[in-house]
């Protein structure tokens, strides 16, 4: 683990981190702020008390880096696009309330009987329309490829290269890539290679070690090399800590600091 890791802005994903911070989800926000984090993120807002979230965020003065636009569905299927776009409208309103910078967009699962290129093109159409909505709200959209080998069997968008091709077709500067280093490595990608032509296209980043999806330092990722590749892509935003801690949150963070030092 390079000392460089701790020079990045870090954004804990509160679905897994600070789960030991209190009985209610807003307590996780307070615990993260107490630990010195100025940015946090989570998966979805629809299963949470938004008023309580908003109060905790305002109280702690934190920024939400990202949460998932709902409903998720299958944007590989054009028949779902109206529902998806209505969800983006609602999610943008929530994002403004919660001081969120980005909405995460997922492709949904593959349609087995439909040509792959047609599904990829359908994502581009949906993102172009969603991007227009998000731009009016001042919110970014980030498209996330996921691994299909371990965690998300059947998911359509498993390749960083394909995600970048879709984003180039969309051509909106506020519709960018959510690069998840863990998912990328699990899919056998070389981060330096897939990020080589991604300058200006990475809107957010998630990290966890692989194998295992635990805190950095517990797996086999060459962190110095991969963080250098990320810097070379022009990305200088937050690293979302989306890992399953092998110990309590504070202990896992202390472990990262210890091996980074």
Language-model features, listed with the residues they occupy:
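Histidine-acidic metal/acid-base catalytic patches
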Residues: 1-36, 99-101, 157-179, 183-261
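Active-site-proximal loop/turn and secondary-structure-junction residues that shape catalytic pockets
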Residues: 16-18, 44-46, 70-73, 109-111, ...
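N-terminal substrate-binding region of glycoside hydrolase catalytic domains
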Residues: 29-46, 68-73
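Conserved beta-strand positions in the central sheet of alpha/beta enzyme cores
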Residues: 41, 66-68, 104, 142, ...
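Active-site-adjacent beta->alpha loops and helix N-cap segments on the catalytic face
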Residues: 46-56, 113
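Short hydrophobic interaction/assembly module
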Residues: 54-81
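Active-site acidic/histidine proton-transfer and metal-coordination neighborhood
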Residues: 59, 78-176, 186
